From Swiss-Prot:
Gene3D superfamilies: Jelly Rolls. The gene is ppnP. CDD domains: cupin_PpnP-like. This is Pyrimidine/purine nucleoside phosphorylase. It comes from Geobacter sulfurreducens (strain ATCC 51573 / DSM 12127 / PCA). It is an enzyme of class 2 (transferase). Keywords: Glycosyltransferase, Transferase. It catalyses: a purine D-ribonucleoside + phosphate = a purine nucleobase + alpha-D-ribose 1-phosphate; adenosine + phosphate = alpha-D-ribose 1-phosphate + adenine; cytidine + phosphate = cytosine + alpha-D-ribose 1-phosphate; guanosine + phosphate = alpha-D-ribose 1-phosphate + guanine.
Length: 104
């Protein structure tokens, strides 16, 4: 889906890692939320409360998911699932545009 209709955008930015990751929250009529953001090159570890689906719209990163010691390359047009109450690490290799869907 390349656009969202009938949504509310929270104007205040979500800023992480001194501006290395910045996003805006989109709230849908049913109350579900997504964030649309940009990641600068760097290494970032995030923790989750709810399960998430991360869609990489453009860019490239190496990903380490919970319970794994392996790094996997993820690029534009790909996505990955993150379980609830966990953490994951990304080594962002180039400017990366993403959409994160919160499932819980």
């Amino acid at each position: 889906m390349s656009e969202f209709t009938n949504v509310t955008i929270i104007r205040e930015a979500n800023v992480y890692f001194d501006g290395g990751v910045v996003s805006r929250t989109v709230v849908f009529p049913d109350g579900t939320k997504k964030t649309l953001g940009i990641m600068q090159p760097g290494e970032y570890t995030f923790t989750t409360g709810a399960p998430e689906i991360m869609e990489i719209l453009s860019g490239e990163l190496d990903l380490k998911l919970p319970g794994s010691d392996a790094w996997n390359r993820v690029g534009g047009g790909e996505s990955f699932d993150v379980p609830a109450n966990s953490s994951f690490t990304m080594k962002v290799l180039s400017l990366t545009d993403y959409c994160c869907s919160f499932l819980g």
